[in-house]
Amino acid sequence: MALAGLPPAAPLPCWTEVCPLSAREPATDPSGPPLDAYRHNLPRPMSPLIGRSGELAAIGACLDANRLVTLTGAGGVGKTRLAVEAATERTSRDAIRCFWVELATLRNPDAVASAVASALGVRETASEAAVTAIARFVGDRPVLLVLDNCEHVVAPCADMAGRLLARCANLTVLATSREPLGVPGK
């Protein structure tokens, strides 16, 4: 403290805001505390969201009433940004964990579940499929899973989301896509 020019009893400014996400370790035991070690891995916007409060409120209402919500629209209309804001609001309001999965660069449709497992820090094994490992990791804990840019992997996203929702009672999925996922009951 003296080297920083601060008196010995001075509080350290804002250090805790930087550490939680950078200190996150990948989960090795899907049943354990790593899920509770942090609240989210959401991207941080560079600027505030302006003029979209109506859409944001509607998304919040949809998330309150449904376990799977897909934000659809043409490219560039702000689906991703709205998803970030809606997920941020939800993690701030509720005691849930949120996992962001960016799918835009995914080239292999068969790798969707593996990409989600990786984002959650879940390690697949030869004897356990990715969806099974993810479901075991999430369990009955309240989790919001955000799948961004699903349009080029709609079918595998829909399949995985349906299977996870059937296994995880407190899981909610928010997806962004140029077309609906088409999961029954959505």
Locate the predicted segments by residue.
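A conserved switch/coupling segment of P-loop NTPase cores
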Residues: 61-65, 87-95, 131-186
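AAA+/P-loop NTPase substrate/partner-engagement loops
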Residues: 95-96, 100-115
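Conserved NTP-binding/hydrolysis module of P-loop NTPases
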Residues: 109-125, 139
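An N-terminal, helix-rich hydrophobic module
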Residues: 1-29
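Short, conserved phosphate/pyrophosphate- and ester-handling motifs at nucleotide-, phospho-/glycolipid
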Residues: 11, 52, 79-80
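P-loop NTPase Walker A phosphate-binding motif
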Residues: 74-98
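Conserved adenine-nucleotide phosphate-binding loops and their immediately adjacent elements
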Residues: 19-61
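Short hydrophobic/aromatic beta-strand immediately N-terminal to the Walker A/P-loop
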Residues: 69-72
